[in-house]
């Protein structure tokens, strides 16, 4: 039976697909009949539930910051599935830090050139390289969808995460600008900006320690904030599947006239 989204036979490329949002998105594509190319730096292929899935999976270790790695991935994907239809630009990193740390100038949690270069390389350069490589395929084929994963931080800014927020704002600008360039070729470009979620691949202990330091709170208080009951009108954190549901809809032909916009998935917390 064909699903309402009708993704049977489509091929989606998902970066950062070994964990968190990316893995949930990849699994959802598989469950809805799409073939999926999962790209990630993790040398160990993650486990997916393929038993009930109608789509096929290809895992390719990919460094999205290196053009040659991206090109090699595209060639492997085409060899496996032929036509490529969807790109989910999900790969990203977040290293919390302060612009100025009066308690420890130029210390561990103050923004450095190394951190700046690392975060912008993945979150901006990686998005551009993937979009350009798949964009060539989509323009040549006369159709395609690019979905750029942003964040509520990119819309509102975020204490202790200024460089991450800046990169996500750049991604929002990519979405708007590329939509003006690629629409004439029947290539849609849209964005998704999640708010606080129950769990993501970014939330390690080191991340929590860094973010709690930049905000002057304990890790325990930070974790209480994940529940998000007071700051979000819906009174809870989001689920990874709720993000994936929107991604799948935007990737489908049901969203064929949606182009050049970034959608919030933040329980009403973020607007704009």
Predicted regions: what they are:
Residues 2-6, 156, 236, 246-248, ...:
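Short C-terminal tail/terminal secondary-structure segment
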Residues 4-37:
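Canonical Rossmann dinucleotide-binding motif of NAD(H)/NADP(H)-dependent dehydrogenases/reductases
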Residues 98-117, 228:
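Substrate-binding pocket helix/loop in short-chain dehydrogenase/reductase
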Residues 131, 167, 175:
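Active-site helix of classical SDR
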Residues 136, 180-181, 256:
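Alpha-helical segment proximal to the catalytic Tyr-Lys
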Residues 151:
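Residue(s) in the substrate-gating loop at a strand-loop-helix junction
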Residues 183, 188, 258-260:
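Short, small/polar-rich loop/turn modules that mediate ligand/substrate recognition or access, typified
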């Amino acid at each position: 039976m064909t699903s309402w989204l009708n993704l049977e036979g489509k091929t989606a490329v998902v970066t950062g697909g070994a964990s968190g949002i990316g893995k949930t998105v990849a699994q959802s594509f598989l469950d809805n009949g799409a073939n999926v190319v999962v790209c990630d730096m993790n040398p160990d292929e993650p486990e997916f539930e393929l038993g009930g899935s109608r789509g096929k999976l290809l895992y390719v270790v990919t460094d999205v910051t290196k053009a040659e790695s991206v090109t090699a991935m595209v060639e492997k994907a085409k060899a496996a599935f032929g036509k490529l239809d969807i790109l989910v630009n999900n790969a990203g990193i977040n290293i919390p830090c302060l612009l100025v740390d009066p308690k420890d100038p130029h210390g561990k949690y103050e923004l450095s050139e190394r951190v700046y270069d690392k975060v912008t390389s993945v979150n901006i350069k990686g998005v551009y390289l993937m979009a350009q490589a798949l964009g060539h395929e989509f323009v040549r084929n006369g159709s395609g969808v690019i979905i750029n994963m942003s964040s509520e931080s990119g819309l509102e800014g975020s204490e202790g995460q200024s460089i991450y927020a800046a990169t996500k704002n750049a991604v929002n600008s990519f979405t708007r600008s590329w939509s003006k360039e690629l629409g004439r070729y029947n290539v849609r470009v849209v964005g998704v900006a999640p708010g606080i979620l129950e769990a993501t691949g970014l939330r390690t202990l080191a991340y929590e320690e860094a973010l709690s330091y930049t905000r002057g709170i304990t890790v325990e208080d930070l974790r209480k904030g994940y529940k998000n009951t007071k700051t979000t009108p819906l009174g809870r954190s989001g689920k990874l599947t709720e993000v994936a549901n929107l991604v799948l809809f935007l990737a489908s032909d049901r969203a064929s006239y949606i182009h050049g916009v970034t959608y919030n998935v933040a329980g009403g917390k973020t607007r704009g």
